[in-house]
């Protein structure tokens, strides 16, 4: 774990820094270096949580601007993650539930089923009797978000990225304005950082965390380095090697170096904190409808040598000792177990939501360590590397003779949908940033809050998904085999409360900023909270809190918590477990 604070942070105890920040703002204004607009609430990041934050504040009568650095709204929810990771359904309320109700209404129209019929759609998460629908196509999700923002009369600004060098102007503990790379400036009374990266939070001088804490830091059991967790439990995880794979360029020869995708170093001390971040990938939308299918093609930078690890795993016949009956390998691209003619997750209109499968799937493990604190150019490079890895993996399964025929043959029936991501070559517009920066606030949500052993006051929403982390690295074990490390799948017994102080910075650091996406949580707890329905819940609550801070002329930390609770309940938020 790394605890960080932006070098230029302003503090109420440091008059010189406060005056410097104010002077910088004044100088910039005098120079006329870009258009300036003023709003009550400024939301940075058009993620699912950013949309609900903006809509909630606008519905409370505030003037709101939503700034999205890219061209699309909805983040992962409109970027391929159509098979919602739900957790406890009963904990989803407010604008989050309204979104899924609108999905249900969309598919209630027979005209929505262009490439299939409603009775063909099957999912263990879909109950036709419910008022919500949790599986949907990406373009449908984005249209719903656009409609919500238009109806609430939120000003939406796309294609504007925060200036990471001098883009946040503070006076004391208050953010006065934020400036984009173009020079465009936005003044506000309350700011909400709803980005996956937490750039506004970091550049406002707010303390934050990156990586994994040690177990000892917050009294947890599943944080930090976990090389023996699955082996000790003998759990045949979909993300762990179950067959023996040699890691060396020349098999058996450590002097020849490691093949692509294996990191140096052995198991390491168990439970020790580090800088590592769980792996990212793109959630792909694929289809097997011929008239709507764009065939897979060979990427220009395709390098078959990068997939030697995949080839060795697919062709290994030696089971590792703790997994003697692990069964067949799931298809790393299509995600099925080869007994089905289609991916596990089928969406409306014969589309898929294809996530990482197996220890050598879509995740570019260890390719994201620099992402959380990187500048825009470095992040763009990291995104390109993820695209390259994933598109190359697809072509490897289409074309490489090292791929057994039972894995190659199904690929001919699948491709990208013509009617999705039409302005990005049918490739998702959003990388799955599973975890980046995390606020270090007065309340840090931990494993013990999620499992119910520590109480949480001032609830602003509920979580209910398992504490889930993807792998952070591959290493060579004591027997010379490749292993993965970092997977966590720690279930929660029941829905748990998320406290208001987890989305507010410490008061001495910033008093008009809310952070509902990169909220204050340990690596383990964030693994549960980081689900898209919860981001929408927390965004909604942040929007209401922002409006109340303005109405009460109070710091976001000092608003009347009883009034916040009353407003959230009136708006349909679920703040407690339903009575049995």
Where are these regions (language model features)?
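Conserved beta-strand-loop-beta-strand element in the redox core of flavoprotein oxidoreductases
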Residues: 167-185
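Flavin (FAD/FMN)-binding glycine-rich loop and adjacent Rossmann-like elements that form
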Residues: 142, 184-190, 194-579
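Bacterial N-terminal signal peptides
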Residues: 18-29
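Conserved N-terminal/central alpha/beta ligand/cofactor-binding core
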Residues: 62-63, 68-169, 209, 217-219
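Bacterial Sec-dependent signal peptides at the C-terminal "C-region" and cleavage site
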Residues: 27-38
């Amino acid at each position: 774990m790394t605890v960080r604070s932006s070098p230029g942070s302003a503090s109420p105890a440091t008059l010189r820094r406060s005056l410097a920040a104010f002077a910088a703002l004044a100088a910039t204004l005098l120079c006329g270096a870009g258009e300036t607009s003023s709003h009550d609430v400024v939301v940075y990041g058009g993620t699912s949580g950013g949309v609900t934050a903006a809509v909630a504040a606008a519905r409370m009568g505030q003037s709101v601007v939503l700034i999205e650095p890219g061209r699309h709204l909805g983040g992962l929810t409109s970027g391929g993650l159509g098979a919602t990771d739900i957790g406890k359904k009963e904990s989803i309320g407010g604008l989050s539930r309204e979104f899924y109700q609108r999905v249900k209404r969309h598919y209630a129209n027979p005209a929505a089923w262009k490439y299939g019929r409603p009775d063909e759609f099957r999912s263990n998460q879909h109950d036709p009797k419910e008022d919500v629908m949790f599986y949907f196509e990406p373009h449908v999700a984005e249209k719903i978000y656009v409609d919500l923002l238009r109806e609430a009369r939120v000003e939406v600004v796309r294609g504007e990225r925060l200036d990471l060098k001098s883009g946040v102007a503070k006076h004391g503990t208050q953010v006065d304005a934020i400036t984009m790379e173009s020079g465009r400036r936005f003044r506000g009374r309350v700011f909400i950082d709803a980005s996956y990266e937490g750039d506004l939070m970091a550049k406002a001088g707010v303390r934050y965390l990156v990586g994994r804490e040690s177990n000892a830091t917050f009294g947890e059991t599943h944080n930090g380095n976990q090389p023996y967790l699955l082996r000790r439990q003998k759990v045949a995880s979909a993300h762990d090697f179950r067959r023996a794979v040699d890691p060396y360029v020349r098999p058996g020869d450590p002097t020849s170096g490691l093949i692509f995708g294996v990191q140096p170093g052995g198991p390491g001390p168990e439970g020790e904190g580090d800088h590592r971040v769980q792996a990212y990938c793109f959630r792909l939308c694929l289809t097997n409808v011929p008239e709507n299918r764009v065939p897979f093609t060979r990427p220009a930078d395709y390098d078959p040598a990068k997939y030697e690890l995949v080839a060795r795993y697919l062709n290994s016949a030696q089971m590792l000792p703790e997994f003697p009956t692990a069964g067949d390998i799931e298809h790393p691209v299509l995600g099925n177990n080869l007994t089905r003619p289609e991916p596990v997750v089928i969406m409306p209109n014969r589309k898929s939501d294809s996530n990482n499968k197996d220890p050598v799937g879509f995740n570019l493990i260890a390719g994201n360590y620099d992402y959380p604190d990187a500048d825009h150019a470095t992040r763009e490079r990291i995104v390109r590397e993820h695209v390259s890895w994933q598109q190359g993996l697809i072509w490897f399964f289409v074309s490489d003779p090292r791929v057994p025929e039972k894995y190659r043959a199904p690929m001919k029936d699948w491709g990208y949908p013509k009617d999705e991501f039409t302005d990005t070559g049918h490739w998702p517009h959003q990388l799955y940033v599973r975890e980046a920066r995390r606020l270090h606030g007065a309340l840090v949500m931990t494993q013990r809050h999620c499992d119910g052993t520590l109480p949480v006051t001032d609830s602003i929403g509920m979580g209910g998904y398992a504490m889930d982390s993807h792998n952070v690295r591959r290493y060579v074990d004591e027997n010379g085999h490749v292993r993965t490390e970092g997977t966590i799948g720690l279930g929660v017994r029941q829905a748990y409360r998320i406290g208001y102080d987890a989305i507010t910075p410490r008061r001495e650091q910033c008093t008009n900023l809310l952070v509902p996406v990169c909220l204050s949580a340990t690596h383990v707890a964030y693994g549960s909270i980081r689900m898209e329905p919860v981001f929408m819940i927390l965004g909604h609550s942040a929007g209401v809190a922002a409006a109340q801070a303005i109405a009460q002329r109070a710091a976001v930390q000092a608003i009347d918590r009883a009034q916040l609770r009353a407003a959230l309940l009136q708006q349909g938020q679920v703040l407690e477990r339903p009575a049995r």
